[in-house]
Amino acid sequence: MNKLIIALILLFFSLSQSIRGQEDNIKVSLMTCAPGTEIYALFGHTALRYEDTARGEDWVFNYGMFSFNTPRFIYRFVKGETDYELGVTRYPYFEGSYAMRGSSVYQQTLNLTISEKQKLRRLLEENYLPKNRVYRYNFFYDNCTTRARDIIEKCIEGKVVYSEGKERLSFRDIVHQYTKGHEWDELGIDMCLGSEADKPIDTRKQMFAPFYMLEAAKKATIVVGDSVRPLILHEKKVVDVEPEDVR
């Protein structure tokens, strides 16, 4: 009997170590990229990084793929009449492309359980099916940042709670923060925005802008029953090519 108990204890610890190791092998991160000079890059960019060291995988899932050759692209871009799609690239290529462009990249590692990480992977793989990967882009409500946020929330077993900011900005206020110094782009965007863009918006709506999403994620918590944990484990700058913070 004692031998059986010892064997069961050893089996339990062996399984525990296996599960713990499996969890440690997987890391999912929210990636936020600094703005570029093209109109579609003025606001920065958001993507998701999925790392599994046991499998040698390091992928970036990017909801910001599009064709710039689309007729009247800029007008359709702002009006929400452009089709975007989910693309997948290897992380070194993603990092290298932003380093060459001269844009810094921030990585926020998500505080997910192993089951949440696995669910997120399944959701991303489902999104990447040819029948699902293309979507109708909306400048404020359905873009690379909101898609990343929404799929993170779908994989979490509890609820993500964001801290409501004190400053109630409008869509136009935020747009102008990023179009400063790009007068013609700003004018073109302003001409496409309606009066709704001047109304104060809450924190969730402000997350259409990548760096507003970054700040919201930094303060967010995951609530499961009586348990509360931060959404972000830690943050670091993985591409550092700018003399000062762009935020």
Predicted regions, residues:
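Non-catalytic terminal regions of proteins
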Residues: D245-R247
